[in-house]
């Protein structure tokens, strides 16, 4: 595959983070095994090629189903088509774990962000309160009253 075949990106753009890949490589091997820099680079290239292969096949599966977005099911089917069926169970388990962790993160962020559960009116009132605080800070701590509906305020400007 030509490096420029990857959606107009150069070879450098279509790579994986070296530090992360080096860490993964070291974690997968016994502690007494060292990997030469050239071998690490080759492994990274192989990983990029594998990702491109699975992505391309997933896209083909997606297109055959007249879909516009590649779904996890398309990736699993692509693995089967490419002869990597023995990995499907492990990949699916990793996908389920990812979904679970993402759901946990979302629930935690909602718990720590009470604004996410405000009604539109409450959010607007909170926004106005924060604007008033900001105006007070900008005016040296002096609170400047603001009309509730500036577009209908008929007061004349003070000289």
Swiss-Prot record:
SUPFAM superfamilies: Histone-fold
Single GO biological process annotation from the record: regulation of DNA-templated transcription
Basic and acidic residues bias spans: 148-159
A UniProt-annotated Pfam family: CBFD_NFYB_HMF
InterPro entries: CBFA_NFYB_domain, Dr1-like, Histone-fold
PANTHER family registered for this protein in UniProt: PROTEIN DR1 HOMOLOG (PTHR47173:SF3)
Similarity comment text for this entry: Belongs to the NC2 beta/DR1 family.
Name of the protein in its database record: Protein Dr1 homolog
Region listing for Disordered, in residue ranges: 135-159
Compartments where found: Nucleus
One GO MF term attached to the UniProt entry: transcription cis-regulatory region binding
Gene Ontology CC terms: nucleus
Keywords from the named record: Nucleus, Transcription
Designated gene of the protein: DR1
């Amino acid at each position: 595959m030509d490096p420029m075949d990857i959606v107009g990106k150069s070879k450098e753009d279509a790579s994986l983070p070296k530090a992360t890949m080096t860490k993964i490589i070291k974690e997968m091997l016994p502690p007494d095994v060292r990997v030469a820099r050239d071998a690490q680079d080759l492994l990274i290239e192989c990983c990029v090629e594998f990702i491109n292969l699975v992505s391309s096949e997933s896209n083909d599966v997606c297109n055959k189903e007249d879909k516009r977005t590649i779904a996890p099911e398309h990736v699993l089917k692509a693995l089967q088509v490419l002869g990597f069926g023995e990995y499907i169970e492990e990949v699916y388990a990793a996908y389920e774990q990812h979904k679970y962790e993402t759901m946990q993160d979302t629930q935690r962020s909602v718990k720590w962000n009470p604004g996410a559960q405000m009604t539109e009116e409450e959010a607007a009132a909170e926004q106005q309160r924060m604007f008033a605080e900001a105006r007070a800070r900008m005016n040296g701590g002096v609170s400047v009253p603001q009309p509730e509906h500036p577009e209908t305020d008929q007061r004349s400007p003070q000289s």
